[in-house]
Amino acid sequence: MVLAFRSLSRTIKSPSPLLHSKSNFISRVNQSRRIPSLVANMATPARTQPPWKEPKASSAAKLKVWNSLTRTKNDFIPIDPEGKEVKWYSCGPTVYDDAHLGHARNYVTNDILRRILAHYYGYNVKFVQNITDVDDKIILRGRQQHLLAKFKAENPTVTEEVINTTIKAFDAYVKKNLPLLSQDVNIGSFNSDSAEKYANVIQGKSVDGVGPPGDKEAKIKMHLRTAGTAVTSLLAPSKSTPEDVDVFYAGAEDVLLPYLDSLYGSSIDASDHSVFTTLTKKYEARFNEDMRNLNVLEPDVVTRVTEYGNEIVSFVDKIIKNGMAYSTSDGSVYFDIENFEKREGNHYARLEPWNRGDTNLQADGEGALSSVKTSEKRNDSDFALWKSSKPGEPAWDSPWGPGRPGWHIECSVMASAVLGEQMDIHSGGIDLCFPHHDNELAQSEAYWQKEGGAQWVNYFLHMGHLSISGSKMSKSLKNFTTIREALSRGDWNARSLRIIFLLGGWHDGIEITPDMRKSGSSWESYVTNFFYKVRDLEVHPNISSTATEDEKVLKSFESAKEKVHSALADSFDTPTAMRAISGLITDYNSADKVGLSDSVSFDVARYITRMVRIFGLDGTADPYDGGIGWAGIDIPSAAKEHVYAVSRERDEVRQHAIVGDLSDEVLDSIISQHNAAKQQDMEALPYAEVLSTFQENLKALASKKAPAKDFLDLCDQLRDTHLWDLGIYLEDRENAPAMVRPVDAELQAARDQKEAIARQKAEAKLKREQEEAEKKAKLAEQAKINPKDMFRTEEYSAWDEEGLPTKDKDGADVPKGRTKKLKKEWEKQKKLFEEHLKA
């Protein structure tokens, strides 16, 4: 039985956001992408990029973009003659595992650029995103998980047979991945043997101890952890309870997976595509959820490899007919690089010509299930367009026999099917430059062959890496934090992560350090506090404004807008744009608010709101609805009536208490303004109760003729306890009403720190008091001793009539100097003893 593709050439509206990269394709020498000279030792006929054809402009370009096809900034000119439509294809997920923060870097950054083009420049962007649901990694993972599940079902307890199988799996894993260990290494000596043989790696050095560690050493550490975890499971004293069995399999899983596949992988009935689709559907759904949680816009069109089977076969067949691909006797089809480059205008490896001879990158691009050497390939660099399926691999009908598409051809076909013979933008992670994107370009240009050569993509955008404290995230190295893990732990949220990417730029790599996180948090707090201030003007208008500061703030406003515009036009320079926004807020904060019109404040705030929404920092909010602020700065709607009322009452009480004229008449006037006793809905009830309780407490204090201090203490209690516990804070300001705001993370952290300091002081005080009490108690006990008895110890053998020692224990006279010191101690004790007797 052959697993059939579902033919689908029409475009598909996505039900959910999909913006992922070829996730595991990242173990490589990244420096070579930026510095061609680093790979000068590789055999390659070309080291410079070929000419790029600039699109014809119908009007002046609005911006420049860094184009990987030229390694410089080019005017952005859409293909659309009217200059309105933009066709964009973005490489999407290979759905076999959860996405990590490195993937978030790619998709969120793609989303930022897409939003700027659409919402700032007004382009009508058609954004196409693919799902890779046929791939070597998917086949391997699906097969391995299927076999492990079957093995666990057949072995619900840890029997001797399971132990023996796991030991064999461990041996196979160590032999393949840790070659410095002896071939007969056993589980009992593994920890000591590995500590000796891989001491340099464990100590953070390279394997040979010369030079810094790299990906090779990172992989060795991963293999040491995997093997070590399996050893722990094998040596566990108890494996009898269901919990023990779960722990055993969890520790042994990573050595069992490849071993079971090596034994039984080829026996899998690959026509049962549920083996693979169970995996891909699960992780596509989880990926969609991750993207929603990161506030990434849905693609306009989603394509899946399994929905483009007929198109892929037709695409490959046309490349063969165009003379730039050939089939082999096993039913595979390879791209003919030599014949391709014989055609005028054709160039292989447009993006990274200096890497075209890198056999490691080529092998990565061909996939884990590809043969190391194919004798029928005309050139070692020729890459697979169609792979003949081996036993245990899914297969599709084709003119060349049962097989499956190569990785690179999938994107070429899907992008061409939706966007046609040419697109404006193609994007993805920097790791995909060579060979994936270079192969995409070559095979697509071979398909759309034109006189003088085709230019399938006009602008190639590659997102920089993400590293955390120097370590690049990689699934192959198992050193990643998944998106859902980071969000659920509270390490990040959609806004904080996006701010980091905005501050770091899109093209260069970003390293998240403590300082970088602090900068992102500070920027967010700065903008949030600005929004608080301006939104407060809606409740407390500045009616006495003299407008003397308007001109200065408006001048700064215009300057900031120009800086932001210039920055975005300069290849989406978001770091500069972010600095311009915070600089505008600084100028606003320095202005004398008495001399600033509310209308100017609102204009500045609306602009900043529009920009942060364009950047995707405020959920799905419309950048052009005229709103002010972003999510998180409002108190609940049900709270507003009662909280603003109690805040006004509190302001008046404090004002009168401070000046000393808080009479009963004044208090009655204040309380009578708001009635908290009326019936409330359930959501409003807690806030109404706060207002009611405050009014009752005011009346109680008034009836007792309490001093002003008690009223001020009550006002503090309202702020610090009653409202705080409901997530609301009243920020007292000099000569202005209190500002009502929600309790946010910054406020909570400040209070936690304040309380921690107070606790430390209280604990230190208590310790001092305890030590003082102990000291006093010790002195009290000491005072009870008669000075005549204090030296009657074994240290001495004779004393005078006052109890002072005259002979030591050996009968020798006590030295005069010693006697003098003893006399002082005796006199001190005599005084204490006399005071004790008096007491």
How would you label these PLM feature ranges?
Residues 179-180, 184-214, 250, 449-451, ...:
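Catalytic adenosine-cofactor/nucleotide-binding cores of aminoacyl-tRNA synthetases and other
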Residues 2, 38-43, 95, 113-126, ...:
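N-terminal alpha-helical targeting/anchoring segments
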Residues 91-93, 262-271, 389-397, 560-564, ...:
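Short glycine/proline-rich turn/loop motifs
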Residues 2-73, 79, 153, 242, ...:
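Basic, alpha-helical terminal appendages of large translation-related enzymes
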Residues 123-126, 322-329, 726-732:
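Short, well-structured beta-strand/strand-turn elements
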Residues 60-143, 147, 212-230, 248, ...:
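N-terminal catalytic cores of NTP/NDP-binding nucleotidyl/phosphoryl-transfer enzymes
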Residues 43-56, 63, 130, 154-248, ...:
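Active-site neighborhoods of enzyme catalytic cores
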Residues 43-96, 111, 282, 286-294, ...:
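Alpha-helical recognition segments enriched in aromatics with Gly/Pro capping
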